Amino acid sequence: MNEQYSALRSNVSMLGKVLGETIKDALGEHILDRVETIRKLSKSSRAGNEANRQELLTTLQNLSNDELLPVARAFSQFLNLANTAEQYHSISPKGEAASNPEVIARTLRKLKNQPDLNDATIKKAVESLSLELVLTAHPTEITRRTLIHKMGEINNCLKQLDNTDIADYERHQVMRRLRQLIAQSWHTDEIRKQRPSPVDEAKWGFAVVENSLWQGVPNYLRELNEQLEENLGYKLTVDFVPVRFTSWMGGDRDGNPNVTADITRHVLLLSRWKATDLFLKDIHILVSELSMVDATPELLALVGEEGASEPYRYLMKKLRARLMATQSWLEARLKGEKLPKPAGLLTQNEQLWEPLYACYQSLQACGMGIIANGELLDTLRRVKCFGVPLVRIDIRQESTRHTEALGEITRYLGIGDYESWSEADKQAFLIRELNSKRPLLPRNWEPSNDTREVLETCKVIAEAPKGSIAAYVISMAKTPSDVLAVHLLLKEAGIGFAMPVAPLFETLDDLNNADDVMTQLLNIDWYRGLIQGKQMVMIGYSDSAKDAGVMAASWAQYQAQDALIKTCEKAGIELTLFHGRGGSIGRGGAPAHAALLSQPPGSLKGGLRVTEQGEMIRFKYGLPEVTVSSLSLYTSAILEANLLPPPEPKDSWRHIMDELSVISCETYRGYVRENKDFVPYFRSATPEQELGKLPLGSRPAKRRPTGGVESLRAIPWIFAWTQNRLMLPAWLGAGTALQKVVEDGKQSELEAMCRDWPFFSTRLGMLEMVFSKADLWLADYYDQRLVAKTLWPLGKELRDLLEEDIKVVLAIANDSHLMADLPWIAESIQLRNVYTDPLNVLQAELLYRSRLTEEQGKSPDPRVEQALMVTIAGVAAGMRNTG
């Protein structure tokens, strides 16, 4: 196995060496020696040397306050470099995943070999491909944008060094550049000083588009086209772009008072400005390239006499002028100036598409297909993927905010209190108002600030250019009136089109009721008329797992999707399921291919819409080549799920899942909700309280400032347990339930489920991944250093439970060790542990010092606080996900 990763290991070792030289230059030999000693002790401790483990603990406990930060930074930066090397390895010619685009070819060959599938059926499935990736600014992207950029540059250096033909002097130049970049990273503060604003988050999203997706999407389509031509003799049409990007940055106001209507308006303008900026660069290249004279009569008629000598350039220059005028107008609007709209303002994709496509058709007709299919084709595909808005945005708001707004309106009008009405009365009122021609909102009424904000947001949606807002997502949706209420508020704002409104079902009860809610809605004639045969429903993964534990949540998600698919099919409605997955297992994260194939049959017929969160955006779309790889994996998984759907689970399997769900939920809630020691234990054994100090996302960590675990957002909840390596939310309850079913004599049935049902095997695979990252001795060390002795028995009980869970999962999967079928991931975790362990031990020490200072009423030591933040960021890098 090691041979396969020798290229990765040698890159990691080389980057570590350069980092060591940088530390020596910056801080002297003694600090480097200290870091090296700790690294060697950690390696030996991992290999099972108990004496060296004790020495590691003592060494880190005895660091002076001046040594804390350099040591923490050394290991944290090393993990960032290891992640960079690993990301490069995934796309390098020597890496195992080098040709993920090849995954499409493999899938096409597999499909062609199916006796009941012909080329026409496969072609039809390709043509109906739809993939919408929704970028969210969860506070999980811990790494600063400036460092992400440097990591990208380091990646380029690794690529150049991989070239066997590189001359010695070039190799020296690349190595010098690598040293500069690592030195720049070392001398850059890795922790942000302020929380990012929602606008900063949106700019981070635009940077991903510019640095990676802009090139990655056309490259992916070329790759897809090549594989289709080779395997099916079929070419993609110019306008076929199955990928769209949407963003929650600047649109997601659920529990985030910092996202206001004004912010959303600003982000929409900023997004359009960025689109003009990127398209101007494209057009600049096309003006230079399209110097041809031959053109069709249609194109010559379009350019007239004035443009006859260089018709293509003439059209491109005209388009450039329109883009520049649009950009100037948007710039003025962003500065708050109210300017009249210029003639030819670009607001719709067709305005960009038409002149470009006219050039394309003419070049093809005049025998210049080779030119048409170059830079011009890439730009046309960008128009289809990104277009005038660049990325569309979703608006997300919590259901109670709409209920409160309507309550305020009905009370003012003297017709009662909407908030206290029954569901039937609410629906009757809403349908009556939706059918009414008169406005509901009184003219001179002064609403409260909260209600004004809800109404202003609806006004922003109504005024935005059509197509720039993708959907309105209602979090914590529970009833049909939650959906109708939003439609009424949008109608009152003067919206002139049917905006997709997606209820988000996210607690266990809401998932179980999702089908009833949608059935009631689809039985309302007005509603059926409005949606025109299309419905989007969002399935929440994070909050359901936090509410009931992963096993119960994942089964509720499966059943809700299954029921919704069948209901919509019966009603002739095209359903798009929108998956709100996180990067970590406790928030529904799983490798894309496995996750999609484990969903109910038919769940991808309406395409895939899924959130891509925080740090996962960088891992999956941080480089153009990685983007090609990720999009190819999604494409092959969607094709496979639609053409070779997983089997319907047997009734006996469903009964077992019902049983597992009940037992695991009872176990999970028994600890999290009912054990009086649990919350004090959680608060002391993890850095939960300290996490609030990290300037991560623009969203507060809690939905409400007071309250226990239930008010904590899913992300800090997971993040805290990831830091102390117990990883509790991602497994608690699951193993206990499996053990009980095994004791009931159903092990062989569980083994069959693991073998023949992708849903179940993916669940077990995700548990194995979590178990591989969890660490009993580190979790125990946090307890000893930070937790009151009276709470130690609870910590021991949880660790014993984890050990039992690992045994039962291995027995069902028939494996002797974790991750046996994914050695690449096991290797990656082992590689990191040597550097993550010292950060964990150091973090426990820093938490101890920080809390002691607070207890003594002294002011915090900035060296301790800063080092603590660095360890939190470093462990997140080591675990490859935060929350």
From Swiss-Prot:
GO terms for cellular component: cytosol. PROSITE patterns: PEPCASE_1, PEPCASE_2. The active site is at 138, 546. It catalyses: oxaloacetate + phosphate = phosphoenolpyruvate + hydrogencarbonate. Its EC number is 4.1.1.31. Its cofactor is Mg(2+). SUPFAM superfamilies: Phosphoenolpyruvate/pyruvate domain (SSF51621). InterPro entries: PEP_COase, PEP_COase_bac/pln-type, PEP_COase_Lys_AS, PEPCASE_His_AS, Pyrv/PenolPyrv_kinase-like_dom. It comes from the Bacteria. Keywords: Carbon dioxide fixation, Lyase, Magnesium. GO terms for molecular function: magnesium ion binding; phosphoenolpyruvate carboxylase activity. It holds the Pfam family PEPcase. GO terms for biological process: carbon fixation; oxaloacetate metabolic process; tricarboxylic acid cycle. Belongs to the PEPCase type 1 family. HAMAP family: PEPcase_type1 (MF_00595). Forms oxaloacetate, a four-carbon dicarboxylic acid source for the tricarboxylic acid cycle. PANTHER family: PHOSPHOENOLPYRUVATE CARBOXYLASE. This is Phosphoenolpyruvate carboxylase. It comes from Salmonella gallinarum (strain 287/91 / NCTC 13346).
